[in-house]
Every structure is written in structure tokens, then in C-alpha cells.
Amino acid sequence: NDIIRIGAEQELVLVSKDWSPALNYDVFIKEAQEPLLTTELARFNLEINLPPFEFKTNAFQKMESTLREKLSCLQAIGDDNQTKILLTGILPTISWDYLNFECMTPNPRYEALNELLRSKRNSNFQIHIKGLDELLTAHPNILFEACNTSFQVHLQIPQDKFVERYNWSQLIAAPVLASAGNSPLLMGKRL
């Protein structure tokens, strides 16, 4: 198949008026009735899965307009429930209080993932990030992963072009990530 398609996933954070995580993901799932909307690891995260578009001159405009439409719908639900929709890499206001099992989305998939990764490690998850400050911790579950969200682009290409395009994507990943990272704070540490 020579048709090139592009799609995306937009992860987002739900926050309350004081910018702390809002654990009301279920309200959005129920009220939106949107097949492109799905849960994420934590009760304060959601994900919009955009449909794939044929990669032609207007593919990015279609992606943007579809995403804006979905975000607008979610923000209307948020307005009715004192919740803001936030697109950010790392939520700078997150605290350890939100990284416990009560904040995990109740889904057997996430519980199984946590159990599997814990059993493979046979220890806590070690986190060590050096920046202006240093964050060094051992966390007992996978919820530390819920601190960050992303915008992921998916590109479907012809099989014979995969190696070249994959290598190209690896070359640009670091500078794109460096320029797109938007929160230097995690657990009160300057990273």
C-alpha cells in the first residue's frame, strides 16, 4: 500500500481551579460519548485518538480542526464540572499525593501492567533526573508515568521506506523534544 497516512494522539491533564489534578475523568468519558476519547493511566488524564488522514496538503489542517473540535467539547464539559483541560508535558503542580492507587484509572489493563512491571523489576521504580535540582526517588508503582502527557504523531508509510524514515525520525527526535518540552518543574524540583 503506497498511501501515506498521518494520525495523532493528544494526551491531556484534567485540573481543578487551583491547578491540582482533578480525578473526574469518568465524567468526561460519560458526558462526551466520544469514540475518539479514551482513558489513560491516571484518573486525571485522558487521551484523544485522532483518526488517520491521508497525508496530503491539508492533512495538518484536518488534524488541527478535529483536535480543536474535540478539545472544545471537552472544555465545555470541564466548564460544567469546575475542571480545566490542560495540554502540558509535565504538570508542574502535581504532588506525591496523586501517585497512589486511588488515583489510578480503575482498569484491569493498568493494574496488570503495574503488576507485570513490578514483578519484572522485583523492586521499586528508580527515578533519577538531574537538572538545576536533582530528583532521586524510588516509587512503588507505575503512576509516576502519569506525571507527563504528550502529543504523539503516527505516520503510516510504505514498507520499503520504513528504514530510511525511521532513521530520519531518530535524528530529529532529540532537538524536537528539547524545543517542545514545556515544564521545567516536577515535584517541586527544577529540572
State each model region's role.
Residues 1-191:
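Phosphate/nucleotide-binding catalytic core
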